[in-house]
Amino acid sequence: MGDVMIQSVKTESGLVDGHHGSCDSLGCVVGALAKVAKLVVALAALVLNGALCVLSLVALCVGATPVGPLAVLVATTLASFLCVAYVLFIAAKDRGWIASTNKC
């Protein structure tokens, strides 16, 4: 069977009753895997972004790196930041990772 998740059902009295139901839908599994993949990509981009920021600051402080490679580092850092922003905010229809996961 599929994963068990809590579903809310509105009763005749207007109260919301929560109960456990199974989610066997392939769409739910694929949707959950897609959200996890987006999160992994975003976290990898954040790590890359942080590493490139540190490298560019070290190169700037030491003065051992010419301006050209430093500009490439800054541009790559900016591109990484934009990728994270796209994955986390623009590409996500629900504007969040935990919003309404029980659409089975």
From Swiss-Prot:
Concerning what turns on (or off) its expression, the entry says: Cotranscribed with incD, incE and incG within 2 hours after internalization.
Q: Name one GO cellular component term.
A: extracellular region
Q: What is its main location?
A: secreted
Protein name, as recorded: Inclusion membrane protein F
InterPro entries the record matches: IncF (IPR035119)
Role of this protein: Inclusion membrane protein probably involved in early modification events of the chlamydial inclusion.
Do the record's keywords include Transmembrane? yes
* Parts forming coiled coils: none
Respond yes or no to whether keyword Transmembrane is given for this record: yes
Keyword line: Host membrane, Membrane, Secreted, Transmembrane, Transmembrane helix, Virulence
User: Where is it located?
Assistant: Secreted; Host vacuole, Host pathogen-containing vacuole, Host pathogen-containing vacuole membrane
Top-level taxon of origin: Bacteria
Transmembrane segments annotated in the record for this chain: 39-59, 70-90
What topology in the membrane does the UniProt record assign? Multi-pass membrane protein
One matching Pfam family is IncF
